[in-house]
Swiss-Prot record:
Binding of S-adenosyl-L-methionine, residues: V49, E71, G73, T74, S79, D97, I98, D147
Pfam families: Methyltransf_3
Name of the protein in its database record: Putative O-methyltransferase MAP_2558
CDD domains: AdoMet_MTases
Family: Belongs to the class I-like SAM-binding methyltransferase superfamily. Cation-dependent O-methyltransferase family.
Source taxon at top rank: Bacteria
Length: 222
């Protein structure tokens, strides 16, 4: 036997893939602080990473060294809490969002988790403008979870921010499968494909696409 799991009779490949993702999501439990932050995100209509994506973010952050992390798209702080859980005790999370209410709720989530103000830097404004002010080759990990239309711009800036050995992580890299549908050609799909192309063609990066959440494209910089 080759060790490959056989499909059950009548079980199609897509349903098996969906079962694997569902199992991955069910394997991660969130504490009360994360649950409260997630509930606030739902209340205001802010997107939030799934628990499995959050666990992956924590893992990648820890593997990267986790001292300087940049996040594009704060939301209500769910992803920020996961990132902080993988960071060193003296690490600083820089997180950017254009919505003041999102930043307020994220600040609340961080405070409830006992994370001191010296460990987070919340910046309001357009990410395209804020990112240009951040230091070159300084960050261990850059997480992009914002409007897919702007992914190419964020990828260019995000790679610039990465130190050698750093990791860039792009959420919504599959758009629920639309990015892989040859017939899909709307503006979001075109932008997401362009972001993926930029990463794939950058010889400094080693990428992988992970089918969790809305698709995670991660790449480490040489």
């Amino acid at each position: 036997m080759d060790g490959t799991d056989a499909e059950a009779p009548g079980q199609t490949a897509p349903s098996r893939a969906e079962s694997l993702v569902a199992h991955a999501e069910a394997s991660i439990s969130e504490d009360a602080l994360l649950a409260a932050a997630r509930e606030r995100a739902v209340d205001i209509g802010a997107g939030a990473v799934t628990p499995a994506v959050g666990a992956l973010l924590s893992l990648l952050t820890k593997l990267s060294g986790g001292k300087a992390i940049a996040e594009v798209g704060t939301g209500a702080g769910v992803s920020g809490l996961w990132l902080l859980s993988g960071m060193s005790d003296d690490g600083v999370l820089t997180t950017i969002d254009i919505e003041p209410e999102y930043l307020r709720l994220a600040k609340q989530a961080f405070a409830e988790a006992g994370i001191g103000p010296s460990r987070t830097r919340l910046i309001g404004g357009r990410a395209q403008e804020v990112l240009t002010r951040l230091a070159d080759e300084y960050y261990d990990l850059v997480f992009i979870d914002a409007d897919p239309i702007d992914q190419p711009d964020y990828v260019v800036e995000g790679v610039r921010l990465l130190r050698p050995g750093g990791v860039i992580v792009v959420h919504r890299a599959a758009l629920g499968g639309r990015a892989g549908d040859p017939a899909a050609r709307d503006a979001e799909v075109v932008a997401v494909r362009e972001a993926a192309r930029l990463i794939a063609e950058d010889e400094r990066l080693t990428p992988a696409l992970v089918p969790l959440g809305d698709g995670i494209l991660a790449a480490v910089r040489d």
